[in-house]
Amino acid sequence: KEGYLVNHSTGCKYECFKLGDNDYCLRECRQQYGKGAGGYCYAFGCWCTHLYEQAVVWPLPKKTCN
């Protein structure tokens, strides 16, 4: 599974500005989803890869980004 990293309290994606390989996105994806996750910046949001199937990614149901 893969998808955008989401802030559970706001419902917003984690923003990034350096597209492609991005240390910030990689670190944040691994912190939230574990060491096996990958991450890079895609369309100005942190995109996480190699996630477990139950991983929660953006968009959150019933929670819009404010």
Swiss-Prot record:
* Stretches assigned to the LCN-type CS-alpha/beta domain: 1-66
Tissue spec. comment: Expressed by the venom gland.
Q: Pfam families annotated for this entry? A: Toxin_3 (PF00537)
Top-level taxon of origin: Eukaryota
- Which positions carry Asparagine amide? 66
Write out the entry's keywords from A to Z. Amidation, Disulfide bond, Ion channel impairing toxin, Neurotoxin, Secreted, Toxin, Voltage-gated sodium channel impairing toxin
This protein's major location comes to secreted
Please describe what this protein does.
Answer: Beta toxins bind voltage independently at site-4 of sodium channels (Nav) and shift the activation voltage toward more negative potentials, thereby affecting sodium channel activation CC and promoting spontaneous and repetitive firing.
The protein's name: Beta-toxin ChFII.7
Q: Which organism is it from?
A: Centruroides hirsutipalpus (Scorpion)
